[in-house]
Each structure stands twice: as C-alpha cells, then as structure tokens.
C-alpha cells in the first residue's frame, strides 16, 4: 500500500500509511516566533490551514515552536494520542493533551501494527528526536534537522523525510545538516523515496 503525504510547509506533514493518519510537527495557524521575541526570527503563514480530520496520532520531533507550535496545537483535538520528545511533551501537556507518550532516543512505542522508534536528533539545546515509523506494509524515517543517530543499523526504509540543505546561524552554528547527511541516509536506508523538508 502506498504512503500518502501532504506537506504543510516548514516541518509539518500529514502521513497516511497502512490506514493510519499521523500529523507531524504542524504549523497551521498564526505567526511562528522564537524566544526572546519576533525581532530574532518571525515566520508568517500566507494562509491559515484547517487542522486535518481523522488524525490517529500526533507525532512531535522537538519542543521548539517550529515543531510544537502552540497556536496550532490549541486548535487540535486534545484527545488525540501524542508521541513526543521530552521537550515537546511539556508543550502539549501544558496545552491540555491527555494521551501523551514521551519517547527518549532508543525508546519504542508499539500499538497493534504500528511501531515508532525514537532516534537521537538535533541538540537544540537538548537532544530531540527523529523517528523510524514501521507498519506491516511501510516504513518511514524522519529527522527535521539532518542529525543522524549513529546507533541506527543499516536497513531498508520506504520513505525518508529530511532537509537537503545545510544551514547555519552565527550564534547557533550549523543547525541543519541536510546536504551533509543525505549521502549517509542513502547508504544506510536505501530509500525508495525521499521527501525534502524545510525549516
């Protein structure tokens, strides 16, 4: 069965695999700002997007606003199960989600035919998550900053979602390593398909 994907821009995806609909890192409403204020970085949506219906799972890679965007999360049904990094779990707990599973790198979530393994991701400043998602029919790897967990063993992955450019800021250094990591992902996963994400 084919994987269906809708890209919302930035880090946001709606994926459907084996009839399971997973919303990842959505930014659908309002401006995107980072502490200490919008004078540093401010993102604006050209148009607000309605939250998709029939979501089976909300998957959050990081607690930063471009991954766990509070105005967007406020408009999503709080009874939807959430899988999240440690920092993202704090965000959704504060907003009122009731079914939160926190995964640290190396930990796994299992539910019927769905298996989600957290991998070590970017350090912004704490270690955040990438994920390997498996069902009986499909497999996906996603890590939004291009940080590859060196403990992952070679295996076949159907779909890899990754940035494909490197990006640096004077204060933060290189915090997106897509161009650097892409050859490693190709060798490690031999993916059928690659989707490029942006931040």
Label every model-predicted segment.
Residues 8-18, 110-161, 176-181:
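Catalytic core of the metallo-beta-lactamase
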Residues 20-59, 71-75, 148-155:
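Pre-active-site segment of Zn-dependent metallo-hydrolases
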Residues 24-25, 54-68, 83-86, 141-146, ...:
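Active-site neighborhood of phospho(di)ester-bond hydrolases with catalytic His/Asp-centered motifs
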Residues 44-109:
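Active-site HxH/HxHxD metal-binding segment of metal-dependent hydrolases
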Residues 87, 148-199:
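Cap/insert and terminal regions of metallo-dependent hydrolase folds
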């Amino acid at each position: 069965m084919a994987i269906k994907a809708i890209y919302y821009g930035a880090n946001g995806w709606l994926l459907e695999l084996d009839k399971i609909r997973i919303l990842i890192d959505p930014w659908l409403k309002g401006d995107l700002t980072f502490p200490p204020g919008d004078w540093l970085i401010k993102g604006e949506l050209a148009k607000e997007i309605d939250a998709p219906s029939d979501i089976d799972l909300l998957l959050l890679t990081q607690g930063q606003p471009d991954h766990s965007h509070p105005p967007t999360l406020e408009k999503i049904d709080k009874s939807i199960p959430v899988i999240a990094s440690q920092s993202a779990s704090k965000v959704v707990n504060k907003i009122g989600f009731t079914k939160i599973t926190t995964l640290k790198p190396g930990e796994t979530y299992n539910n019927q035919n769905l298996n989600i393994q957290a991998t070590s991701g970017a350090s912004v400043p704490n270690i955040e998550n990438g994920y390997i998602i498996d069902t009986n029919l499909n497999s996906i790897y996603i890590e939004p900053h291009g940080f590859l967990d060196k403990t992952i063993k070679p295996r076949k992955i159907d779909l890899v979602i990754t940035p494909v450019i490197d990006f640096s800021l004077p204060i933060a250094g290189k915090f997106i390593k897509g161009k650097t990591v892409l050859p490693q992902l190709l060798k490690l996963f031999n993916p059928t398909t690659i989707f490029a994400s942006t931040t």
